[in-house]
Amino acid sequence: MKIFKNFIGLAALALCLGFASCGSDDDAPSYSNVAVSNSEMMTILKAKGYQFDENGKMLLDDKANSTSSLDLSGTKVDTAALKELSVFPNLKELNLSSNGYGETFDFSVLPAQITGIDLTNNDIYNYDNLVKVTVEENGDETVEPLHNITKLYLPEKAKYNIAQIMRFYRQNKSAIDGGTMDVEMQNGNGSLEKYNTLREIPNETLRECLKENYAELFSGDKINILNSATL
C-alpha cells in the first residue's frame, strides 16, 4: 500500500510539472520568424515602440499584432527596406507620404499583404510592377495586377503617367466607381481628389490645335488620356 501511495504521489507530481511546463510555454514571448536586418528600419520601428530580440526578430505582442496601418511618412526610409515589414502579421496599409521619393516607385518592394498605400507629397512619376501589360499582335492589351492594391493615394505627378496608373485605373474603373477601391490623386493645391483621366492643356493655341485635329480625345477643354490610350 505504501508503494502504491508513493506511486500515486509521484504520478501527481509529474502531472503537475507537465501542466506547469505547458503553461510556461504558452506564456513565453513570441517573435517573428524573420529578422529585420535593415538598421534604418529597425531604428524607426523601435522609436515607434516595437521591440526586438538580439537577433532582430520582432516581439509579437499586442502592439505588433494589432498593427494594421503603419505611418512611415517623413522618415525618408529607403524603399528597399519595406520588404522587411512582412514581420507584421496583420499589416495592411502604409503611409509613405513626404519621404522624398522621386521618379520611380517599385511596388515589388511591398510585402504581399499590403493593400493600401499613401504616396502623396513625393515626386514619383513611374510606378513599376503595379501592373503587367501584355500587348497582342492585333494591338489588344491584357492588364494583369501584380499587387492586390485596393487603396492608392497618389502625388500630383501621377497625372502624367499613362503606362501604369492609367491602365491600373482602366482595369479597375468599375470597382473605383463602385467604391470598393479607393484611388485618389493630389491636385495642384495638394488636396486629394478622386482619380480621373481628364488633363488640362494650359497653352490655348496648342489646346485648340489638338481639339481641331483630335476632337474625340476631349471632354470640354480637357483631354481624356483614357481615350488617347485606346487609339
Cite the ranges covered by each PLM segment:
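Short "repeat-start/strand-capping" segments in structured domains, especially the N-termini
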Residues: N90, A112-Q113
